[in-house]
Every structure is written in C-alpha cells, then in structure tokens.
Amino acid sequence: EKLAELGVARFQPVDTARGAWRRAAGRRERWERLAVAALRQSRRAHLMEVADPLPLERAVRELPAGCARWLADAGGQAVGGAPAGGGVPGAGLVGPSGGLEEAERAAALAAGFLPVRLADARLRTETAALAWAAWWALGSA
C-alpha cells in the first residue's frame, strides 16, 4: 500500500533462501486490493503491478536494460540526498529478515546492483522497502 502511494510501478516478490513467498498463499490478492486503495488515496495515474514471486536470480536477470539497480545492504555506501533518477526506471532489492545469502548477494551484484545503506540502523524488510521507495521518489520528483 505505502509503496503504491510513493509511486512504485511494480512490486516483485522474490524467493530467497531465507524468505520464500510461495508460503504466502493469498498475499498477492491482498496486495492487489491494497494497491487499488492506494491508487485512490494518492490520486496517482497508474496502478502498481503486483507480480508473481520469482527466484531472486531470475528476477535480477529479467530487469530491463537501462534500469538503475540498488541493493539495500548494511555494508553499502550511505545514501545521501536524492538519487539521480530523472525518469530512469529504478529497481530496489531488499532482502528478507536475516539478509541475503552470499550467493544471492553475488548474483545481485553481478546483475549490476549497487549496494547502498539506507539507514545507520538495521531495518526490517518492510521498512527498508519504504525507505528505498521514498529515497527513489525524491530523485524522480
């Protein structure tokens, strides 16, 4: 819901070693209803797409060329100010509770994701996703 209010165009759940969306029966339908409610609330012109879960390695490979890629990573460079979005599509990858496995992190880095630290504190998955979306929205405004 909050991601849609911030203008996120697509929510792509990913299956990882520490967090499997396949166990979340019924979640997609709920998220779609929340996206519709957020569209009405925010008066945005486009409905956020809620995609079917994909394995992380496939999800990062299937991003369009030219898409800016950011990995929420406690060891990454601290974000400062707004990103230089300027209308370029962006993808934020937020890991599950406990973080990504090293092989998953390596796959994201190999796919061009840049590690960024969204806060000094360790954030929960939902909070990190909101922090990334708000940060990206600043650069797209």
Predicted ranges, named:
Residues 20-21, 88-91, 139:
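A short, structure-level motif marking secondary-structure boundaries and short turns
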Residues 55, 99, 128:
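Residue-level recognition of oxygen-bearing side chains
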Residues 54-60, 76-79, 123-124:
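A short acidic, often aromatic-flanked loop/helix-cap motif at beta-alpha or helix-coil junctions
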Residues 20-23, 100, 124-125:
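Secondary-structure boundary/capping motif
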Residues 1-70:
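RNA substrate-binding interface of SAM-dependent RNA methyltransferases
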Residues 4-5, 76, 107, 129:
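Hydrophobic side chains within alpha-helical segments
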Residues 66-109, 113-118:
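Active-site/ligand-binding-proximal alpha/beta "capping" segment
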Residues 102-141:
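Structured adenosyl-cofactor binding patch, chiefly the S-adenosyl-L-methionine
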